[in-house]
């Protein structure tokens, strides 16, 4: 009886000792493998002199801050430049090979062939419906027309700033603007915007909420409308929904990879809604109107100075992304 118990205890002790020995042996082997592996890695890393080829590549992901290539003093070699020009420019140039000519002129300023893209738009009104800016640097050429000052100003405000926008259902809800950065932006083939300000009892101030003909008209048959109303006051809106979309937008700050060049005109357009200031943004500039060949020669001559007041950013602009985040 007692012999069986002693035998069981002895077997258990032997098993424990054996397991302990096995675990220690495995631990020693693993330590040996790990230390030798780390030793090899350290030796290889000290001897190797490979370059990190990713360090000079342009960033194409989502990014809010300005991108600076600290390892290359010629960032234009890895950048793309888009020039947006009206159809009237190509008609005036009257040369089917003008893009190649201008590209070779850009080459003399450090921009390689294939890095400069030329994008034509019909006119300011049409460009306002679906602006698309996809290059690292984007320069929009706008020919000044006295009857298009408001359109040019609103388009420049849209392009030179980043906006965070959300859809508006004007048939169901009232809306109010919270501060100066809050605007209602409408785009479409024909936008007519009417507003009716409301008091604290949601009754119309100078208008009837049930009669849109009594609303105040702020835009008629426009392609692009940036509506600014009294902050903190609710409004009932009437919008031509069939041909126009409206969004509630917040201006986040400057879009620093875009510059607007005004062609002609006595003064640079003011894109700020604040009447108490006369600001001058470096990325809104003007060149004298002569012939379009002269305009492009001037742009080529000053391209590097223009780019220096800009920042290379990854965020692109198109009509879909604009509505939610630019």
Curated annotation (Swiss-Prot):
PTM notes: N-glycosylated.
RNA-binding in keyword set: no
UniProt keyword Disulfide bond, yes or no: yes
Disulfide bonds: 82-135, 165-249, 191-244, 196-207
LVD motif: region residues: 237-239
Region annotated CNP motif, chain positions: 165-167
Anything else known: Some rotavirus strains are neuraminidase-sensitive and require sialic acid to attach to the cell surface. Some rotavirus strains are integrin-dependent. Some rotavirus strains depend on ganglioside for their entry into the host cell. Hsp70 also seems to be involved in the entry of some strains. In group A rotaviruses, VP7 defines the G serotype.
Protein family: Belongs to the rotavirus VP7 family.
Name of protein: Outer capsid glycoprotein VP7
